[in-house]
Regions:
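Conserved alpha-helical positions within TPR/SEL1-like repeat arrays
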Residues: 9-20, 47-62, 89-104, 131-146, ...
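Short coil/turn linkers that connect adjacent helices within long alpha-helical scaffolds
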Residues: 1-2, 40-44, 82-86, 124-128, ...
């Protein structure tokens, strides 16, 4: 091993020790030195140089300097993309890190690009947790929705559902959660028939897995009530609001934010059909539960 390469290895060992003991300022200084050594020892697009760029970027991000961190992480990623044959795991980790960082910096288009790269690499790897891919797909969908590109969001929800069902089978709590997200998306898009069908699938799964008073069952029933409420089927909406309230109240837990949403929505419905007295009684009952 040449002298510069040996020095680089020694610095990285010291860097690992500093990171393990949470000495961040010292670790950043050592990482900066290791990077300068790597530039001399590994000219060109070599993996050790990418490693040094990435380590310094990660440390700067941990230290709250995300903008500077991004520049180093981008250099690391550019090197990784040139390596032949490509190291898909390294590309996945690098792209995912940049995607989350850009997302946090509100650099939406860059975040989407890196999420796409991470997803593409991750789908080629057998040991990537399905939840990692699902989270990234959901994040891309959220970015599209926030920017008003609703139609672009739907394929990402469907892709996430496909991954979860392939990994877990059709009857699993995580599958129900993905179905719930998709159905809420359809509700927001006023695609009520699709929203109803998908929410019913989620509810069916949850009823197979949980006792009747489980919060997820209460949530599914409330979401279905919102669908019926939104399309003017007040009788069915009231039925599901009551069922959701019953589940929350029989759980004998302190009222949650979700319980308050059900109360508020159902009270609004009651007032809209001239049942103001019942709405008031419902709100009084909810206040008593809050006060305990």
């Amino acid at each position: 091993m040449k002298g510069e390469e040996k020095l680089w290895s020694i610095l990285n060992e010291k860097l690992d020790t500093l990171c393990a003991t949470n000495r961040l300022p010292q670790a950043i200084r050592v990482a900066e030195t290791a990077l300068e050594v790597a530039k001399r020892a590994f000219p060109g697009a070599e993996l050790p140089l990418a490693t040094s760029f990435e380590k310094l970027g990660q440390l700067l991000d941990q230290n709250g300097d995300s903008a500077t961190a991004k520049a180093y992480l981008l250099k690391a990623h550019a090197i990784l993309e040139k390596v032949k044959p490509p190291d898909q795991l390294a590309i996945f980790r690098s792209a995912r890190r940049l995607a989350f960082l850009c997302d946090n910096l509100d650099r939406s288009e860059e975040a989407i690009s890196f999420y796409e790269k991470a997803i593409a690499a991750g789908t080629q790897l057998e040991d990537i947790p399905y939840s990692d891919l699902g989270t990234m797909l959901n994040n891309v969908a959220l970015i599209f929705r926030k920017s008003g590109r609703q139609k672009a969001a739907e394929p990402y929800y469907l892709h996430a559902l496909q991954i979860y069902e392939k990994q877990l089978g059709p009857v699993h709590a995580d599958v129900a959660s993905v179905l719930n997200n998709l159905a809420v998306f359809y509700t927001n898009e006023r695609r009520y028939t699709e929203a109803e069908n998908v929410h019913l699938r989620a509810l069916t799964i949850r009823e197979k897995l949980y006792p009747p008073t489980h919060p997820d069952i209460a949530q599914s029933k409330c979401n279905l009530a919102v669908v019926y409420h939104s399309r003017g089927d007040y009788a069915k909406a009231a039925e599901f609001y009551r069922a959701s309230l019953k589940a929350w109240e029989e759980a004998n837990e302190k009222p949650s934010k979700d319980y308050e949403i059900v109360v508020s929505n159902y009270a609004d419905l009651l007032r809209s059909v001239g049942e103001g007295r019942k709405a008031h009684q419902l709100e009084v009952r909810a206040r008593k539960r809050r006060s305990g």
